[in-house]
């Protein structure tokens, strides 16, 4: 039967999606299912790994039922996932020994503090391109092994398996036959040397993690195994693409050349700049990461992670009850000509790149008696654009590359006010992708390359299309005046301490 489709499984922090793409990269069908978030203690975030798989299976079933396609027409499956989230399971039974510890969770902060105090920061940064932070997988693995009875003994005997969510999904889809990850996900674990391309023995020793639990690291586009599950009506479909969600979005945005960058505006903001075959070491608070491994070559990226972006709109809606729907925020922002001197620094869980200060908290500056709800909403939206400029400035300094345009996706950038202000404050065109699901599209592209569904990146570039281009309209003096106010607000926030 002719292969007409690629299936992408997009496993995110709050939901899983199954999306079917055709040869032109168009969405044929989509299904989504949320799952339960677990908060055992303040600052801890966990998932039940079985709930994750149930959500994946449910979306696959719903998608196939809704589209009524012949499963045999699916050329391959691409998987993209919430990065860093950690699962450890029993190889024999396939049962997790503890909940998945989510990337957002801060429950390993004490371990990170101990490692930093012990002087490991420079070694970790040199090998991994990352910082010692509870964000990454390595300390989560250590925490589980330390807190589950007999886990260290079982791990040393090779009875346990570790994986990020891509690994967990593939293990289950292949009936426990395949234990793999790709370069992009491995590079986020704090255990992988992104230069030597290996699980690093010094890092494993530092965290007391046996190598026996680790998955094989493979390229981001190859056939890893075949499905062994009834959800595809007995058909064995190649699983052929893997990438962490932000790297997948970079690929889906067709950012294939050094200097090209994308920004995803979700709960947080994740900006990646392609740096080619060179791993650029950041001197300005960014992360160096593997973008993907393809055709025997590794390509790298610089990444800036912003913890609070679109969720500032949720805060305005749910916490402060300033409007009923998130989409209303644009109308409020448009009712005033400027921010009235108000700056919102949304450091609700600290500040990410390029500051990396988990101890600071959110603040508002510039309030006067004439400040209105509209000024407040506008200032909150503007905070996303200012934080993006913080990251871009660091990227351009590190990579010595001047950005020509910024490709964007995510719910928050569908706000036209936000998109225009972002272009104004960066002084570069902001291109909003026609397809919002660029993360899933990137995973589909990787699987399609491995199965021959697509022939080349050039073919994919032809499919990429703009929903709208926003060009800078603000003069330099005003732009720099506004940004100077933001920098002043951030400095004041960094200096404030809760008694």
Curated annotation (Swiss-Prot):
Q: Which GO terms describe its molecular function?
A: ATP binding; glycerol kinase activity
Q: How does its activity get regulated?
A: Inhibited by fructose 1,6-bisphosphate (FBP).
Q: Which domain of life is it from?
A: Bacteria
Known pathway? Polyol metabolism; glycerol degradation via glycerol kinase pathway; sn-glycerol 3-phosphate from glycerol: step 1/1
Q: Which reaction does it catalyse?
A: glycerol + ATP = sn-glycerol 3-phosphate + ADP + H(+)
- Cite the Pfam families for this sequence: FGGY_C, FGGY_N
Key words, A-Z: ATP-binding, Glycerol metabolism, Kinase, Nucleotide-binding, Transferase
Q: Which residues are noted in the entry as ATP-binding?
A: 13-15, 267, 310, 314, 411
Coiled-coil segments on the chain, per record: none
SUPFAM superfamilies hit by this protein: Actin-like ATPase domain
Annotated positions binding sn-glycerol 3-phosphate: 13, 83-84, 135, 245
Binding-site positions, ADP: 13, 17, 267, 310, 411, 415
Cellular component terms per the entry's GO annotation: cytosol
Q: Which Gene3D superfamilies match?
A: 3.30.420.40
Q: Which residues cross the membrane?
A: none
Q: What is one GO biological process annotated to this record? A: glycerol-3-phosphate metabolic process
Where does this protein hold glycerol? 83-84, 135, 245-246
Q: What is its EC number?
A: 2.7.1.30
Function, as annotated: Key enzyme in the regulation of glycerol uptake and metabolism. Catalyzes the phosphorylation of glycerol to yield sn-glycerol 3-phosphate.
* Family designation: Belongs to the FGGY kinase family.
The protein here is known as Glycerol kinase
